[in-house]
Each structure stands twice: as C-alpha cells, then as structure tokens.
From Swiss-Prot:
InterPro entries: Elong-fact-P_C (IPR015365), NA-bd_OB-fold (IPR012340), Rib_uL2_dom2 (IPR014722), Transl_elong_fac_P/YeiP (IPR020599), Transl_elong_KOW-like (IPR013185), Transl_elong_P/YeiP_cen (IPR001059), Transl_elong_P/YeiP_CS (IPR013852), Transl_elongation_fac_P (IPR011768). This is Elongation factor P. Keywords: Cytoplasm, Elongation factor, Hydroxylation, Protein biosynthesis. The keyword Ribosomal protein does not apply. The modification N6-(3,6-diaminohexanoyl)-5-hydroxylysine is found at residue 34. It comes from Saccharophagus degradans (strain 2-40 / ATCC 43961 / DSM 17024). The lineage of its organism: Bacteria, Pseudomonadati, Pseudomonadota, Gammaproteobacteria, Cellvibrionales. One of its GO terms (cellular component) is cytoplasm. Gene3D superfamilies: 2.30.30.30, Nucleic acid-binding proteins. Involved in peptide bond synthesis. Alleviates ribosome stalling that occurs when 3 or more consecutive Pro residues or the sequence PPG is present in a protein, possibly by augmenting the peptidyl transferase activity of the ribosome. Modification of Lys-34 is required for alleviation. It holds the Pfam family EFP_N. The gene is efp.
Length: 189
C-alpha cells in the first residue's frame, strides 16, 4: 500500500493509524516562522466513528488504508447479518449491525447502496441520500389540515419514524432525506 507524508495529507484521504483505518476530515499545514513545518489533522476512525486531532511533523508518513467504496445492491437481512451483492460480479458480502448502523432503517430490498470495504469485509453502509417509502401507520388527516402547520409522526415500511405534515395519510409514498431523517415531500408518481 502507498505511504503518504504529512505534506500529502488532504481531506477524504484514508490512512492506517494505530492499526485502524481512518479518514482525514480536516487538514491544516502549518509553517511556523521558526522550526519545522507540521500538519494539524482531524481524523475519523472508520471502525468506531470516533474523531480526534493529531499533529504530524513534515517528515512523518502514514500508510494508506486498503479501503474501497463500492456500489452494491441490498438483498436481504437474516436477523443477524445484512446481505449485499456487487451487480457486476454477483459477489455477495454480509455486514453486521456495527457496519450497517442507523442505515438499517432506510434499507429496502434491491436498493442501491455504497458499501465501504476494508480488507474485503464491509466496514460501513451508506444508503442513497433520498429514499421513497410508503407510510404504514399515522394518525388520520382531518378536513382543514393545511401544509402550514404542525407535523405528526408516521411509521414507514422499514420501521423508521419520520415527522410528516398533517395532511399526509396512511398508504401514501413519501420522499425522505436519509442523512437527516426529514420528510421532503410526496413521491412523484
């Protein structure tokens, strides 16, 4: 794997630090008037999600992480693992609850997702930014409910609960932003 010196660091670069794959979130190269230049770096551990700050002298190097983002299709869950398939090679991967995390509430069978692989095993799952899901349970809308007003909780087919306007009723398909969990609007037919 490639090695990167402190002057090569940039946001999004994936490196190995203390045996764990990390992504550089922020990078600032500091050149003081006296002394050696250094890089002040914010890193996010890809396994745990923890973010911390480290300082590297200009001569220090880090090894690149063997991390790849792949487009895959979500197949099914068997209760313990979530199964994904690469559409080109039909190779299948199984991810545990740590890798899937909060993404589980947005996954439907045959959805396209981005799977982050580390040494051939799934490390993280990223669902599409927007999904269209049907509402299976919500309070009934009453005559006179308008778009200007309050919201009510609605349960979607995947089990996720989002706040929707009062005029939305059970059985409707809505667009939801998976990053924030916010209602975006009714799905276009």
């Amino acid at each position: 794997m490639a090695t990167y010196s402190a002057s090569d660091f940039r946001s999004g670069l994936k490196v190995m630090l203390d045996g764990d794959p990390c992504a550089i979130v922020e990078n600032e190269l500091v050149k003081p008037g006296k002394g050696q230049a250094f890089a002040r770096v914010r890193l996010r551990n890809l396994k745990t999600g923890r973010v911390w700050e480290r300082t590297f002298k200009s001569g220090e190097t880090l090894e690149g992480a063997d991390v790849m983002d792949r487009d895959m299709e979500y197949l099914y869950t068997d209760g313990e693992f979530w199964h994904f398939m690469e559409p080109d090679s039909f190779e299948q991967y199984q991810a545990d609850a740590n890798a899937v995390g909060d993404s589980a509430k947005w996954l439907r069978e045959q959805d396209k997702v981005i799977v982050t692989l580390f040494n051939g095993s799934p490390l993280a799952i990223t669902p599409p930014n927007h999904v269209e899901l049907e509402i299976v349970e919500t309070d009934p809308g009453l005559k006179g409910d308008t778009a200007q007003g309050g919201t009510k909780p609605a349960t979607l087919t995947t089990g996720a609960v989002v706040k929707v306007p009062l005029f939305i009723s059970t059985g409707e398909v809505v667009r939801v932003d998976t990053r924030t969990g916010e209602y975006l609007g009714r799905a276009s037919k």
